[in-house]
Amino acid sequence: MEHHCGLITSNKETVPLKNISVTLSINEFVAAVVATLNYENEEKVPLEATFVFPMDEDSAVYSFEALVDGKKIVAELQDKMKAHSEYEEALSQGHQAYLLEEDDYSRDVFSCNVGNLQPGAKVAVTLRYVQELPLETDGALRYLLPAILNPRYQLSEQSANSCLNIQKPTVPLEDLPYTLNMTATITSQHGIERVQSNCSLSPIQYLTDDKTSAQVSLTEGHKFDRDVELLIYYNEVHSPSVAVEMGMLDMKPDSLMGAPSAMVSFYPDIPEVEASKACGEFVFLMDRSGSMDSPMSTENNSQLRIEAAKETLLLLLKSLPMGCYFNIYGFGSSYEKFFPESVKYTQDTMEDAVKRVKALKANLGGTEILTPLCNIYKASSIPGHPLQLFVFTDGEVSDTFSVIREVKLNSKKHRCFSFGIGQGASTSLIKNIARVSGGTAVFITGKDRMQTKALGSLKFALQCAVDNISLSWDLPPGLSVKMLSPEQLTIFRGQRLIIYAQLTGLMPQVESTGAVCLKHILQGRSLENRVTFSLQPKANDNFTIHRLAAKSLIQTKDFGSQEASKEEKEDVMNISLQSGVLSSFTAFIAINKELNKPVQGPLAHRVIPRPVMAGSSSMRFYSSFSGGFKGPQPRSLRVPAYDLCSAESANLVLKKSACSAIQKKKTNSSTNKSNLKKEHKAFGENAVVQLISLQKANGSWELDEDLTKILGTKSKDIKAANPAKHEDPSAWSTVLAVVWLHANGTDLKCEWELLERKAVAWLHDHAGSSIPMLVQAANSLLKLSVNPAVFGV
């Protein structure tokens, strides 16, 4: 019997979205983006087309327009409920209508509706947005164009109003009916060193001799198998800067959009200092949902996410300081924790945790992060040990606002370091839980190693806090400052600080300057950064700084319709409508009243498909929440436009041509399962990881059979070569392990740097003056030449 898979129409209609075109303008560390979606209705009936797509959470969307038969229709930003009502009314009257909105449950998911698209009609829908570009640890500015929207697990009590509930069709990459092209123009007064990408780019074209302007494009034939990531390297990215922007002339001079705005960017040179060795409670909250059984990337031999997570937890455990407290949680539809409450870090507790880490599996179903978070926050605080929370998730959570609100409510008692794993992780969730708690957010995509990025954040967590942060302004008489950004509580070494402010009063008519100084105290030492700026800015019709400032204000107040109070909602609405920046309470709507063709019966509804990546696990998760939707379906889903198959994979929306291949894969799944597993690196395959797993909690190594195998030397030869037999035998084996690491694990040094420090500190306490002699003997035995300076001698 033939099985029909997915959504199949009787006459095999084509999808109305034909092309997505993105123009990107990057000036210093701000990106201005223009995205155009080109639609064409090749059917014989009017259509309503819906396209659900991801966008970075920091994006400030400020313009939405449609071009129909040469006529531009500019959308108006309205209260979301009013916009929905007008959209429905326009369609009922035969007008053409367009609606753009954020999802009710996540700020990084948007839906675009094109209603009453007539047969043969072509429409270009354009949206514009601006965003800050995050800074990577190597100094690169990172722009991400999300192409992947992962399925989001459904909370059982969630409303059906979310656009995440729409059954978004999926098709194989080769059958994707629309294309993407992107061109990026980059300018920086400091000069552009290079541009890198995870996708194929055209050769970089420098537009000026001094390399302050450049252009790159995606090559033709780009597949939607990954997010599009650009890494931009400037020659002097660490230079502080201040940009001033004049307000809109038609707005009140003292209003948000009428007064001049300033954007301050500091990159303080904070020296690295050693934190207290016994300070902190470290709780690691690890995603163990089914999606963690996916590969880290599409590259061959890529680790599964859960295997990378296990190695990451091992490295974190080995790098913790003696005397601290820790616990590990795993979460999915339910959650598990290693210990009833956080325990003191000792050899026994560390060994117990390592055994449990090695046995972890991605077997806890969906992604319900809120319940374990509440459990962590309810636990009693440990005096003298501030809570440091590390959250690892692929971001497949639908109701992000509830999670963000819970983290914010507990922000005074902890810092949260968040990690978005894989392409499609929710930027709204990952960025905001870090932002509201004073932590850092990290995204792990492509060839990134989870282990490297996690250890980098642990270094931040172990650093002493920067206290008494303050800003002082030096401005001409008659000019004052109103801060728009929330108070910054913490600055980490290597972290950039962006501040928005409003300049009130009279701007000077002649050339003049202002200055701003960032002051802070680190371990009793006063530090400061000062920068001077011009008060005669160039005109900017996009009002980029004003809109970014408005977005910053919205982010501090907007926690969605389910979480916001009446006062918060009104405040967000006022900021959104005044600035023209989209929020969760507003929506863009445009109506073409010149089209006045009454609709006969319901509009046929077409949901634009998204791609299925090779090796993606997204297919197997649709069925896991397909029956969990409560309440009435959205209006657009009540239109009987498709015949759904009755197969168990009914929520997989694939073209019929792809179904036979999937059926073959099902038939051979049992025989190929073991082979599939072999394609991915298993936990502990790396010899460096094997060596690290043998380290004791105090930082030392003991000489045993496992260590001798890694060193590649017989036990009797090792014992005979020990030049300090009167010392603790562990001193000799610890020196051998550290020497071996420096010779064989240099490419992963950032991952074992903390545990090496612990080993060296232990050696100084237990071997002292014998260290130089031990290092020389270790080099001789292992035939290496590691510099004794790495041991601090």
Curated annotation (Swiss-Prot):
It comes from the Eukaryota. InterPro entries: VIT (IPR013694), VWF_A (IPR002035), vWFA_dom_sf (IPR036465). Residues 1-131 form the VIT domain. May play a role in tumorigenesis as a tumor suppressor. Altered expression of this protein and disruption of the molecular pathway it is involved in may contribute directly to or modify tumorigenesis. The lineage of its organism: Eukaryota, Metazoa, Chordata, Craniata, Vertebrata. This is von Willebrand factor A domain-containing protein 5A. Residues 281-469 form the VWFA domain. The keyword Phosphoprotein applies. PANTHER family: VON WILLEBRAND FACTOR A DOMAIN-CONTAINING PROTEIN 5A. The gene is Vwa5a. Keywords: Phosphoprotein, Tumor suppressor. GO terms for cellular component: collagen-containing extracellular matrix. The modification Phosphotyrosine is found at residue 622.
